[in-house]
Amino acid sequence: MLKLGLDIGSTTIKCVVLDEENKIIYSTYERHYSQITEKIAEILATVRSKVKGVENAAVALSGSAGMGVAESSNIDFVQEVYATRVATNTFIPGTDVVIELGGEDAKILFLTNGLEVRMNGTCAGGTGAFIDQMATLLNVPLEDLDELAKQYEKTYTIASRCGVFAKTDIQPLLNQGARKSDIAESIFNAVVSQTVAGLAQGREIEGQVVYLGGPLTFMSELRNCFDRTLNTKGICPENSHYFVACGAALCAEKTINFDKVIEEVKNYRGSGNFAFNPPLFKDEEDYKKFSDRHAKATVLQKELKGYKGKAYVGMDAGSTTVKGVVLNDDGELLYSKYLPSKGNPVEIIKGFLEEVYAINPEINIVSSAVTGYGEEIIKNAFDVDYGIVETIAHFTAAKYFMPDVEFIIDIGGQDIKCFKIHNGAIDNIFLNEACSSGCGSFLQTFANALGYEIADFAKLGLFAKRPVDLGSRCTVFMNSSVKQAQKDGATIEDISAGLSLSVVKNALYKVIRASSPDELGKRVVVQGGTFLNDAVLRAFEQEMGVEVVRPNIAGLMGAYGAALYSKNKSKGNGKSKLANKETLKNFVHDIKVTNCGMCSNNCRLTINSFGGGRRFIAGNRCERPITKKSQSNELNMYAQKLKMLEEYKPVEGLRGKLGMPMALNMFEMYPFWYRFFTELKFEVFHSPFSTRKIYQRGQQTIPSDTICFPAKLVHGHIQTLIDEGAETIFYPCMSYNFDEHLGDNHYNCPVVAYYPEVINNNMKDVQKICFIKEYFGVHMPKHFPQKAYEALSKYFPDLTLNEVRKAAKLAYDEQDKYRKKVIAKGNEIIEKAEKEGKKIMVLAGRPYHVDPEINHGIDKLISSFNVAIVSEDVVSPRVEKFHTNVLNQWTYHSRLYAAAKYVTTRKDMELIQLVSFGCGVDAITTDEVREILEKEGKIYTQIKIDEITNLGAVKIRIRSLLAAIDND
């Protein structure tokens, strides 16, 4: 008897027919674009016409989207993990591990010693959909991505946990001129990293490994990346992408009536029970009134051809699009262009300028300016007169339409920028931290996944009867909500309108975090390409309860603001140095990638050369590769702290070597433990400061992908110590920190306090050495010697209590000395900055944020703006304990609140809070720090840090803060 198996996945349907010997005699693999039932009916009809005898075949369904159809049509359903296991055991007996990547799901099946399954939960980072998105971003056909990756020379660090994070990494690389082949390989490495760290969760992948699923079938370089990371040679069987369908077929027992089932599948409809919102528009008349009102905010257009007056050029090299405008003296639009950047903004801007000169060869350009992610490369490539930070460009443009504007919201491709305006100056800035679920690319991705162009998809939602209530969630969560709504009978129109509403809710309640729309004021200008979507605009007005102004050039506002800025700066006089026709004719753009090597950062540099001696270097964390001079760290407390820690050199000891991981609280506690164990005659040393290589060394033993990056790094530090021959590693559990009398208690956060237990339970290699993870309480100096003696004498029986007492006294003295040294150095930086009239930035985080691999050189970047940097623990002692709105029981948090309080007393001081993505308790600290600062009229700036290394977005945030302060 023939057997037919269908695997109905999140993006594709696979169908196989097996003969009596379990050989595939027919197979098909097709995308369904969410039209699942129609595609199943079509495939079944095709199979019936092409395969003889299939009418009597046993049929079974599997896959994430197949259960509802199976139930309604009375067809056998086989859970996909079980189907995979059956197929693997049948076709490749002896398999130990199966790694399967699908459209939106990723799985690892451990088949040895019973079945254990690891699946991605809510995030589709590192799956086929993620690779699809990345190929689109690179403007490369998906089928070419694999060949492109094979030509790589260097790789970059790219986050794969989320497609949005990865875009945040890739877009600046493209804007800085990185080679696409290098980025393609980096994308594959990110997928491997996500699968190994996120799914294996500390269990080793060993033995015979089998690769399944579309991405691993069609992309040999992706398989090579897995092989290299796992140090194995995995098997990718022929027809590997059909394995779930084969498993379903192998389990099939019941025959079906094809005609009846095809009819039932075609007629399958959901329940119609889904949460929905009121319609966006009652009728066509309602929509016409809305359109007429918004048509009033219009920039007049004039002809560029034959124009004889003064002209001003503005350009905006954004995250996914490039905009260019030419204005006359009255701010009227002579010419404009809005194009996708296609990963090469330089080429697009060159084309824009060539068109301008072709239309009007005699044009008199007085001044020019550029803004956006690609600002620096464009400024250098084409000799643009001014570079302007995005926030100021958008504010300048908004004032043109509404001089007394109170609030500006700009929703672009990947970012949301909002500014609160008070007394004609930017009073507060909100930017989306890490997620772009409320942005244009979010809608674009959905439209494309459903088989529509974005413009057509947007129009569908205008007159939807029941816009689906999708909440304000991340792209991937939203995928499952959309699929569920479709199963429940929601139309494409309902989904389009629902997504527009969710974009708005995400912007208002997740980015701006407004408790009510009233907080934003009544004089609102909206801009950014996303607001050209009438459904989004209407949803925004409905949610806000106010009528807003949307200029007809909403998508060009960055470029328009840049042009106005250049006009104001030049005062309408002079001649722009912008590249002319001749320069463009001889324009060249060469790219070279190299490592800097001028300091321990060893930054990967992309050197863009444009001929005529013009060049732009990207990827540097300091000015050294450009100026050839060493950056002074004199006014950088982060650099000074690292220098202080480097002073603790190992001293030979009779009791042998003792290693400590330079991670988490060790950045603050090392002086204490160093002195303590040195006095006990150990040769004390620590692992090197973190690098990407150190992270990768411990990657396979990380048990959870949701833990913060600083904690993930601990695994690499322990592995490094073991690899370097450490026979004893000291990494203690510490529930309490020293009491600084700033809070209600003085705990360490749970991760800092108990991570040694995680290491002990997840790293096999620590069992082979002496790993000391006992609980120590440094907060009780009286009891410490006795407790320390009891804990350590188990490992070192020759220790005496007297020795421990002496060592403990000196350790407390050393810690006190180190603490005073930090505060003295910080005070010195503050005094020097005051004398020189420099701004002082409190870069507030945790002790481990001084680690260069964790902060990615943010301290050096801030220093490059001629700003002095101190850490939170320098200024926190200047404040007495005060009331907070949250339980103030963690030492590190108490310092943050005290530092924020102190900053509000100084005009020359600002605070930037560093937050590690995945830090649960920072959900509390960020709100409290924000409240303390904003209450006294200070701007709150937060920078989320993680594996992401590209500082493009960070730079915009810092410049925005500095520009807002200058404007004040």
Per-range role (PLM):
Residues 2, 120, 124-131, 349, ...:
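An N-terminal assembly and electron-transfer interface module characteristic of large anaerobic redox
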Residues 77-81, 227-246, 385-391, 541-560, ...:
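Conserved phosphate-binding/catalytic loops in two-lobed NTP-binding clefts
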Residues 128-133, 238-271, 396, 440-445, ...:
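Glycine-rich phosphate-binding/hydrolytic loop that grips phosphoryl groups
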Residues 35-36, 113-154, 162, 240-244, ...:
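Glycine-rich phosphate-binding loop plus the immediately following alpha-helix
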Residues 166-197, 480-509:
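Adenine-nucleotide phosphate-binding core of ATP-dependent small-molecule kinases
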Residues 65, 200-229, 240-241, 371-374, ...:
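Glycine-rich phosphate-binding loops at beta-strand->alpha-helix junctions
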Residues 107, 254-310, 417, 568-633:
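Acidic, glycine/GT-rich loop-and beta-edge segments that sit at the periphery of enzyme/chaperone cores
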Residues 5-45, 116-117, 121, 315-355, ...:
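Short glycine-rich, Thr/Ser-proximal phosphate-binding strand/loop in the N-terminal lobe
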